[in-house]
Regions:
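Extended hydrophobic/aromatic-rich secondary-structure runs
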Residues: 2-7, 100-107, 241-246
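Residue-level marker of positions within ordered structural domains that often coincide
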Residues: 10-13, 81, 182, 225
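Generic detector of short, well-ordered, non-transmembrane alpha-helical segments enriched
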Residues: 17-19, 72, 173, 216
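Juxtacatalytic substrate-recognition/specificity segment
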Residues: 23-162, 169, 186-187
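Bacterial Sec-dependent N-terminal signal peptides
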Residues: 1-29
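Acidic/His/Gly-enriched intrinsically disordered linker/tail segments
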Residues: 34, 108-276
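Generic marker of residues within folded, mature protein domains
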Residues: 2, 13-15, 35, 42, ...
Length: 276
């Protein structure tokens, strides 16, 4: 059963990160400019698997997020073949400007790329006057929590050790998170087609360097198309098991990792150039 509670501002920042415990939340000076902060009175809405933290005028959005997250979680756990280990925290801002100003001086740089932010296993989302976009942010946040917990654990010490041992390309893990959080769509297909037909990329490495998220998402969708959907998460599992992408690809694709990337480029060229 869901429940509401109020928390103090100090408690809220402890929940977000121990690093912000000494932060000033009323005003910060940058040279001659002074930035005024809103003062938020924080509450949280709790469900079986999520705590949604919100402030004034955010209660209905918090309910929407909590219900959406609970609805999406079982399907995403099934696709990831991994379950949420503990209740996840979602920090909700009513608008992007509030999210920006609340973190000035805290050493966190929010970039306006329309995506979910993850801070120490806590999802930070903001409302863009579009509930579908908010739901997508939540899906991507769940995908990121599930993926990173599975790959690296959810303890800070465990994460650091596992990241050192498991040296996967960032485009690969970010692409899997995007794949898990957002179904392939006409918009994504058009974006990929535009990149492939641009003629800018003769090798996948150049494509992944320039456009890591679409390249990574497209790679996993390619694995689904070419090697079956059930083998997408299995390939990631093999990569973590062997700690070696070549061994993982040889096991599933019967090819080395670099050969799979060449196959990806050839596959996309054939698919999109035949439409010209």
């Amino acid at each position: 059963m869901a429940k509401f509670s109020r928390i103090s501002l100090i408690s809220f920042f402890i929940i977000i990160s121990a690093a912000v415990a000494n932060a000033q939340v009323n005003a910060v000076e940058f040279g001659k400019n002074r930035v005024q902060f809103k003062k938020f009175k924080w509450y949280y809405y709790q469900t079986k698997n999520f705590n949604v933290y919100y402030y004034q005028n955010g209660e209905e959005l918090a309910k929407f997020i909590a219900q959406s997250a609970e609805k999406e979680l079982p399907q995403m756990e099934s696709a990831a073949e991994y379950s949420l280990q503990r209740r996840a925290n979602i920090i909700l801002y009513n608008e992007y400007a509030d999210m920006q100003q609340s973190n000035i001086g805290l050493g966190i740089d929010w970039q306006n790329n329309g995506g979910t932010k993850l801070v120490n296993n806590k999802m930070v989302v903001y409302f863009e006057a579009d509930h579908q976009k908010l739901r997508l942010q939540v899906r991507k946040g769940i995908a990121q929590i599930l993926t990173e917990n599975r790959l690296f654990g959810d303890d800070i010490g465990e994460i650091a050790g596992n990241q050192a041992l498991l040296d996967l390309p960032k485009w690969l893990t970010d692409g899997y998170i995007s794949y898990l959080g957002q179904n392939w769509s006409t918009e994504l297909d058009d974006e990929l087609k535009s990149e492939i037909l641009s003629g800018n990329y003769t090798k996948f490495s150049k494509f992944a360097f320039a456009r890591p998220q679409i390249a990574g998402h497209a790679f996993w969708y390619f694995i689904e198309e070419k090697y079956k959907k059930e083998n997408v998460t299995y390939l990631l599992y093999l990569a973590t098991l062997y700690k070696n992408l070549n061994k993982a690809c040889l096991k599933e694709c019967k090819k080395k990792f670099k050969e799979v990337l060449v196959e990806f480029m050839e596959y996309q060229d054939e698919k999109y150039y035949r439409d010209i």
